[in-house]
Amino acid sequence: MHHHFYIYIYLVLLAINNSAITATTVADSEPMIFNEDVIDEFIENEIQQGFPGAALIVTRFGQVLKQSVYGYKLKYDENATIIKEPQLVTLDTMFDLASLTKMYATNYALMHLVEQGALNVDDPVKKYIPQYSGCNPKNECREARLIKDLLTHTAGYAPSVGFYNPASVPPDLFSQEKNKTEEIIETKLEFQRPRGGDQIPLYSDIDYMLLGLVVEHISGMSIDQYVANNIYQKLDLKHTLFNPLNTNNNYQKSDFAATELNGNTRNHTISFPNVRTHVLQGEVHDEKSFYSMHGLSGHAGLFSNLYDMSILTQIMLNDGTYGNVKFWSKNIQDLFLTPYPYDPTFGLGWRLNRNKSLSWFGLHASDDAYGHTGWTGTCTVIDPKYSMAITLLTNKRHTPCINGTFDGEKYETGKYGKIMTLVYESMLLHKDSPEKL
C-alpha cells in the first residue's frame, strides 16, 4: 500500500493566516513546468520494495510546488515483524532530523548571535567558554581553537566519542549526565589530530556539541530555549523542537516517524547501561544526544516536519529574513557559506556543492547549492540559483538491521541524490534543457 498527497499552493493566498512562505522574489502567474509523476513513481516503487517512509517538499520562488508523503511512519515492531496496521506517513509527521540539527538549530543560533554582535567566528572558543583551556603533550592547546575551526570541522576532534558506553571510552570520559558530558568536552576530551591550517576537514559531532555549548554560554539559555525564543516562535513553527515527548508538549509517539527497531542495539548486538531496546518513535536516536546530553545537543536532537522545514530553508533563500523578521544579514550568511580552501565542500557548517563530490546533491544542483544530511535519513538542498529548496525526510533506519547494516540503506530514496536529480529534471532544470527561471 502506498500513497502521496499533492498540494499546489500559491502562498499569497495563505498570507491571511500567516502561513505563507514569504520570498523576496514572486513567481510569475503562469505555472512553472513540473512533471512530478516521475518522482512519485520512483519513491512509491521503492516503498513497494521495502523502503519504509518518506516525505518530500519542494519550494521555488517562495511557492510550495510539491508536498508529498509516501509509505509508513511505523511499519515494524521490535522483533522486526511488520505490524498488522502500519501507520502511514502524513503531511504533519515529524522526523528525527539527526545532523540537520547542526544547521537548523545550531548554525541558525550562531548566525543570529553574530548578527547581534554577541559572537565573532574568528574568536577563540575560550572567549565564550572560559574553562576551555589546556594542552596535550604534543602542545595542541584548546586556547588555540577558534569558533571557525569547529564550524569547518578542523579543530582536530575525532568524528565521534562514545561517552555513553563505558566499554568504548576510558572511565573519566564516561557520562550519561549532561553536566558531566559538558565538562568532559570542555576540559578533558583530547584532540585526535592537529588543528586546521592546511588540513582536510574531518566531520565531527564533537565540534557541534561544543558549538551548542557556545550558544548556551553566550545566551545563558539552553540550546532549545534559544532557538525556540529567537527563531521558531517568531515563525510560528509548532513542529520544530527538541525532546518533543516531554510532558509540556502535546505530542505523542504516533506523531513521529519511527527509527531503529531495537533502540540503539543494532539488532541486539550492542549493549551498554540504560540502552533502549524498544522501537524509537519521538525520541532522538543519536546516542550521544540521548544518553549523554539528555536530548539537548548542538549536533542532534531536533525534530521537525515538512511545512516547518520549508519555512526554515526559505530563510536562507531570503538571505536571513522571513516576512518582516530579520534573523541575520546577507553578509553573515555569505560568511557561513564561504568554502574552506582545502575542501570546498565545507563552508562554516554548511556542506557545499562546489566540486560535485557529494552525491546527495544529485546531478543538476548548481555550484551555489548547499545543504546538509542527517544519519536518520534526512536531507536538505538549498539552491539560490533557482530560488529553490528541497527537503527530503525519510525514516530509512526503521528497517531490519543485519550485521550493522540497515536494510533501508540500500534504496536510492535514502541516498537522496537520485530524488534530487529527479526534482531538477522534472522541472527541466538540467543541462540538456533550456533553463526556465
Regions from the PLM with identified roles:
Residues L65-Q67, L88-D92, Y104, M111-Q131, ...:
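Short, well-structured active-site flanking segments
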Residues N318, N324, N331-L335, P339-Y342, ...:
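Short, gly/Ser/Thr-rich active-site loops of penicillin-recognizing serine hydrolases
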Residues I39-I43, L56, G62, D96-D122, ...:
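Active-site SXXK
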Residues T22-A23, A27:
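Boundary at the C-terminal end of the N-terminal hydrophobic targeting segment
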Residues T380-V381, S387-K396, P400-G404:
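Short, well-ordered beta-strand elements
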Residues L74, N136-D368:
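Short, surface-exposed loop or secondary-structure junction motifs
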Residues H4-N18:
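Cleavable N-terminal signal peptides of Sec/SRP-targeted secreted and luminal proteins
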